[in-house]
Each structure stands twice: as structure tokens, then as C-alpha cells.
């Protein structure tokens, strides 16, 4: 979470500006000094709402729909919803959530997915921590003290955070149109996959 690293990432991603829209899901190393010591971040300084006009041009254009206001009244891309219209196909509702999302973010996401206008959209959730290489959701075994689990970091010590199993129970399984969850956090070739039916009996690919 250093100025030089953020500047480097911004330069690298600038190639997409005005060419294709970009969507982010912030991770533990985007917060605090090095590794989620707190919720401070330089993400919003380098990637404001209007960083890419195809994501949000500030005048209603772009795929950005909305995000919940923070305590200081700002809307950022840390928690954001996007609508992607697919010609001849099923439109997408993409929601990206902050690292170890707090309750307000999860509740906001649940409300977005539940809106009648998005009933027939294909819902996609982007989140940094969710599935492990073992194909288990993080926290599914009840171990919230595992290094790497959001509850293990200082940002999660107060209890207002969600790991993969928390998200499954609080959001994913309860949302009929949420059919795909994508996450990062696991390094190298550590890729997991699982499919579970949600409470509506529909398959969710994770």
C-alpha cells in the first residue's frame, strides 16, 4: 500500500482507459501499511469513480451503477455494482466488494441483487477472499484463525468482516440470481472450484 506501488499499477492499467471498462476487488495488501493493519487505503486516490470513462464518466455513462456511501458520504469503487449489457445474451449484474466486507457492504449487495429490475440478470460477485485451493470456502471448517482468513487480520478483529463461508450464508445462498463467485487471494496455481445449489435450487459456481 505504498505510493510507488499504486502509481505503478495505475500506469500499467491506464492502457485500458477508454478501451474496456475495469472492475476492481480490493485485497488485504491494499489496506494499512502492508497487510490490512487497518482500513486506510490509497486505492481511491488512484482509482476514483471516473478513472476510466467506460467504467464511469461522471455523467451517467459507463457500466457503473452505484455504490454505498461511506461514513464520510463518499461513493467509491471499493464496493460497487455494475450493469453490463450483453447483445443477444443475458445482461450481467456485477457486484464487487471490499476486502473482508463489512456488514453494511454485504447488506447493500443483498439489496442490489434483490431489486426486481435485476431478477433476470446473471449475478456475479467479485471478492478477494472466498474459496480455498481445497475447494472449501474460507471458514467453512469453522477455523477463523487461519492465517489468510479475513478474521485473522487486524481489519477483522472487531468482528465486522466476512470470510467465504460468512458470505455464502449471508449473501450468496440467499440470492437466486447470484450464480457466479470469483475471488483471488490464493497465490500461484492454487485454484479451487465448487458448485452448490442456492436456497432457490439454482447452481452457484464458485
Predicted feature residues:
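Active-site-proximal segments of metal-dependent phosphoesterases and phosphodiesterases across multiple
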Residues: 2, 104-107, 116-178
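Extended active-site neighborhood of metal-dependent phosphoesterases/phosphodiesterases
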Residues: 2-108, 117-118, 191-206
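Short active-site segment of divalent metal-dependent hydrolases/proteases
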Residues: 30, 131, 188
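Conserved beta-sheet core of the metallophosphoesterase superfamily
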Residues: 159-206
Amino acid at each position: 500500500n505504498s505510493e510507488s506501488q499504486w502509481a505503478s499499477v495505475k500506469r500499467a492499467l491506464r492502457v485500458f482507459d477508454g478501451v474496456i471498462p475495469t472492475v476492481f476487488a480490493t485485497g488485504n495488501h491494499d489496506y494499512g501499511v502492508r497487510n490490512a493493519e487497518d482500513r486506510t487505503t490509497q486505492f481511491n486516490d488512484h482509482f476514483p469513480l471516473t478513472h476510466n470513462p467506460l467504467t464511469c464518466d461522471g455523467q451517467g455513462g459507463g457500466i457503473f451503477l452505484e455504490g454505498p456511501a461511506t461514513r464520510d458520504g463518499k461513493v467509491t469503487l471499493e464496493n460497487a455494482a455494475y450493469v453490463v449489457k450483453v447483445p443477444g445474451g443475458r445482461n450481467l449484474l456485477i457486484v464487487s466488494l471490499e476486502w473482508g466486507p463489512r456488514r453494511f457492504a454485504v447488506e447493500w449487495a443483498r439489496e442490489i441483487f434483490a431489486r426486481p429490475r435485476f431478477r433476470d440478470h446473471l449475478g456475479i460477485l467479485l471478492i478477494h477472499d472466498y474459496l480455498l485451493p481445497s475447494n472449501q470456502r474460507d471458514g467453512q471448517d469453522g477455523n477463523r484463525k487461519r492465517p489468510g482468513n479475513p478474521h485473522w487480520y487486524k481489519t477483522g478483529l472487531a468482528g465486522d468482516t466476512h470470510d467465504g463461508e460468512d458470505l455464502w450464508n449471508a449473501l450468496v445462498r440467499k440470492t437466486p440470481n447470484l450464480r457466479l463467485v470469483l475471488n483471488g487471494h490464493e497465490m500461484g496455481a492454487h485454484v479451487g472450484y465448487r458448485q452448490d445449489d442456492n436456497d432457490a435450487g439454482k447452481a452457484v459456481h464458485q
